[in-house]
Amino acid sequence: MPYNVSFISLGCAKNQVNCEQMMATVQHAGHNIVLSPEGADVAVVNTCGFLASACEEAIDNILEMAELKKEGKLKKIIVTGCMAQRYKDDVLHELPEVDAVLGTGSYGEIARAVDEVMAPGGLRPCYMGDIQNCVQGGARILSTPSWYAYLRIAEGCDNCCAYCVIPRLRGRYRSRPMNELLDEASELASAGVKELIVIAQDITRYGTDLNGEHQLAALLRELCKLDFHWIRLHYLYPDDITDELIDTIAQEKKIVPYLDIPIQHCNDDILKAMNRRDTKESIRKVFRELRERIPGLVLRTSIIAGLPGEGEKEFEELCDFLREEKIERAGVFPFSPEEGTKAATMEHVPMEEAQRRTELLVDVQSDIIDEYNESVLGDVREVLCEGWSEEAQSFVGRSYAESVDIDGKIYFSAERDIMAGEFVNVCLTGTMDGELTGEAVE
């Protein structure tokens, strides 16, 4: 019997890809995918468990589904993803409203779980397969707008940073075979996807587990032969960026000059304690070389404030580093001591102080963004229109310098209707609350 199944995906784009795969699996099994959990037979909450705050968000969503269930507007709740993997016992014992739990190694069991929770008899299955066998490829039902899609090229992580739980939740690093990736990318291009966003926990390591060699540059050259307009890269580790990769990014016009390179900190002692392989000088050298060889490059990074070992001196060093390097985009987060990590056992500043430092870093970054925005006024940029903003009463979109969800937008006027998913040239004329404004030019 077909059931109506609704999916809620939380957390990162990699998790979103897992959700798209589960939707395809459920649909292939004969069930219906519905947008709203209200009135559905089953709601699947695909959780993030990277940070305590992400787990709190997941629990809030589960409790919302539990309320629908209590009101008779939903029949069953299935919890999947990283929080399910990390805290399966807590989910089962503390959330009796949950009818099934699937870990990150068991996404392929989702259709079976739907059938089991809906069957008479009150089964409450818990699937915890080997995380090294997490399904990577296969059919997807895209949940993104038609003009962009993600291509996840690897699963897991071998970096083992002292503050991070990802290897415990996703396993060791596993690259997907290149021919499989090219087949999937070809299907996305044929479906009309214009911006391909290449993702993994660390894309620079791609291929090293297959034959011992870095293969990201070779993969990108093949992807550039397909009918995409933009190819965007998330997340690169600075110590694995090769000369071949830099040359490929610089030479291939479809690869946008926008690189997301998480550094987390710049102090050498902190980097070493956190099991990062970089130093402040090695990071500087990579950034300098990238800017010299890739015209118009926009850099994005991630910063953690309040890491173990960070006193006022180290914090000021971090602020100065951001000012000196003028990194155009940065996500700043307070240190969260995660259970089971080495960093959680180390002495660190109180959460209130980590939050204060986070806010100060955000202020530093805001000044850098304002300076960058002022520097590009008068430029004409190719912008991917994403629709009309009623609030701003203008069209809204992104140039190569703005990635999906995490960066600002460009608000622009035009003398004709611009369709969502259409590229248009925009002259940048002003700024608005840290974002750019402009006028379409034909």
Question: Model-derived features: where do they sit?
Answer:
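Proteins enriched for Cys/Gly/acidic motifs involved in redox and nucleic-acid/cofactor modification
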Residues: 1-206, 244, 259, 281-292, ...
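Short glycine-enriched, charge-decorated loop/helix-capping segments at active-site entrances
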Residues: 49-50, 170-171, 210-213, 272-278, ...
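Conserved SAM/AdoMet-binding glycine-rich loop
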Residues: 77-79, 86, 190-313, 323
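Structural recognition of alpha->loop->beta junctions
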Residues: 93-109, 217-228, 251-256, 317-329, ...
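Short, hinge-like loop/turn segments at secondary-structure boundaries
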Residues: 95-96, 117-120, 214-216, 249-251, ...
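Conserved, mostly hydrophobic/aromatic
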Residues: 181, 198, 233, 261, ...
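Terminal RNA-binding accessory module
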Residues: 337, 345-442
